[in-house]
Amino acid sequence: MNGRLHMTGKELIFQTLRHEPTPRAPWVPFAGVHAGALVGATATQVLTDEETLVRALLEVNRLYKPDGQPVVFDLQLEAEVLGCGLVWADDCPPSVSSHPLADTMTVPCRCTLPTAESGRMPMVLSAMRRMKEAVGDTTALYGLLCGPFTLASHLRGNDIFMDMFDDEDYVKDLLGFCADCAKR
């Protein structure tokens, strides 16, 4: 507690993460692209325009009063940087449409791992900084990432499932690359 009678949502989240008793379960709405609808914006606008994203996130915070909230829920950010094609729609996050490793059982060079300057990452990180400034004292902010297997399936396509039987070492190497992506 912070010396006040009531703890902030952020404090509640951190208490939960420390496996300490809490007075209630934390409220963490994964608003995703629904956040855009709250301000009259499409999913595409929310996921490609920083001003729209921040405006939508602030509206989620005002309306739902969450203890914590993700800044962006787009599991294709890393895949896009690594060469996957995306299909965009105005009512949902983008979908991966092409898989750069579909025709080759290679593991990309670690020199291609996304950085803070890659793709849409600068926009997301800037939105995170702005949200931290606006609500970060009271609301826990979450940064989401694409997990290693999901990213491997984005890169390789459906062949990843046969690869698990046909070439376990390749899958382990590819998952290692994808885990490094998540760690970065």
Describe these PLM feature segments.
Residues M1-D91:
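N-terminal basic, low-complexity leaders that serve as flexible interaction/assembly modules and, when applicable
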Residues V81-R184:
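Active-site-proximal, glycine-rich beta->alpha crossover segments in alpha/beta enzymes
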